[in-house]
Amino acid sequence: MRFTQAELQQFRDRTVPDLLPDPLRLLFIGINPGLWSAATGAHFARRGNRFYPALHRAGLTRHLIDASDGYKAEDLAELHARGIGISNLVPRASAPADGPTAEAL
């Protein structure tokens, strides 16, 4: 999946659904989703993001998750089975340079 900058801008202020499995064993909270994450519907989805490789290297996931094109069913199943949740402090997506305002935080 590829997006132009103009296409990504269409996802500004969109949200990415929280992942909150039951039982929840470990919760990661980001500041706010990026435009790529909003476009794909997956947390930490930008190509090159080290979040999922770090989870895998730490032994928290059995396989390496690549969320750059959105979550695959087996990726969501793995996160749920492991009790790994992901949410954001500010739900609305923005470009990194436009991060959330102090009021939003």
Model-inferred region functions:
Residues 1-105:
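A polyanion-binding, active-site-adjacent surface
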